[in-house]
């Protein structure tokens, strides 16, 4: 049967927009902002350290940040009643 793999989101800030498509070989690019010059991509969680180092060493990458969506409390019950 199919097993769901754990994934991690990465925010990659770029120097130039034309280099955004080069990130496709590292993971699934789900969003690219041309105005802010960043891309959001998902990678397998078991390979995160290696891939973050590889992407960070590329000449067209300004910085790489991991997504913190897993650490944010997503229980919104009662937050609208304040």
Swiss-Prot record:
UniProt-listed InterPro entries: DUF2129 (IPR016979)
Coiled-coil ranges (or none): none
GO cellular component, one term: cytoplasm
Keywords, comma-separated and alphabetical: Cytoplasm
Family to which the UniProt record says this protein belongs: Belongs to the UPF0298 family.
Species this chain originates from: Streptococcus mutans serotype c (strain ATCC 700610 / UA159)
Span of the signal peptide: none
Localisation: Cytoplasm
NCBIfam families xrefs: PRK02302.1
Protein name: UPF0298 protein SMU_1670c
Main location: cytoplasm
Domain of life: Bacteria
